[in-house]
Amino acid sequence: MRLSLSIIIFLGYLIKPQTGFEIAKMIDEKPVPRSLSNKIEMLMKNSKGKTRKKMIISKSINGGEQQIMWFVKPKTDYGVSFLKIEYEHRHDEMRIWLPNFGKVRRISSKKKGDSFMGSDLSYEDLSNRSLNENEYYRLADDVINNIECYVLDIRPLANLKSSYSKNVCWINKSDLTGIKEESYDKKGKLIKRKFFRYSFLDGYSILTYAYVENIKRNHSTEVFFSDLIINQDVDKKIFNEKYLQTVPFD
């Protein structure tokens, strides 16, 4: 029995491979918690195997669109704090309070490739990737640790100030979480590898671990997220420069 033309067209639509943008859009549309409070431990290791640890208290709303972080350990970093506010149609706002200097420093778009507090994360790495500010190319699917993945080549638009020429991302097909990312500099050279793990809390994918390898520096940073509290009422007033100088009880 022959299928009608309309059915053939419909079935063809269902099995049509998704484009890179369509996959990115599905990721962008995933639900995020209204707020997230947590503690962050950063463990940094240099080329000689020497490690340094930093402890942070973080609060954010709307999937990290607004976030404030206070450093509580080590003692030399106590009181340093960081504020990030993301915008849809203009550059994100980033400020860091440096108590030893008694001033707030604004992180300009030219400085977003700089290291965040000596770690292998840059200020740019701390921002969500805006869907419409990048081009997405779907590469061949891959399998990592028995996890089937989409692979996307993500390139910032020419007018976007980015320290990367592209990021290649491995996306878990089952839950649309990014589990691996490779970042390339402006010359197309691989400079960072990043790996991520998530937990599912009340139906949300929440980042609980990140590993960042800086190939250029032969340096690495592990990031552990703990004491996760979601959808708690968070006063939006704290996402303001004046609250950078007020460290909450840890």
Where are these regions (language model features)?
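Conserved glycine-bearing catalytic or ligand-binding loops at nucleotide- and phosphate-handling centers
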Residues: 103-109
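Short solvent-exposed loop/turn micro-motifs enriched in small/polar/acidic residues
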Residues: 50-52, 77, 89, 134, ...
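Short amphipathic beta-strand and strand-loop transition segments with alternating hydrophobic
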Residues: 57-59, 137-143, 197-198
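Sec-dependent signal peptide recognition
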Residues: 1-8
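N-terminal mature ectodomain segment of secretory-pathway/periplasmic proteins
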Residues: 19-100
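Gly/Pro-enriched, hydrophobic low-complexity segments
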Residues: 17, 83, 93, 107, ...
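Hydrophobic h-region of N-terminal signal peptides that target proteins for export
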Residues: 8-17
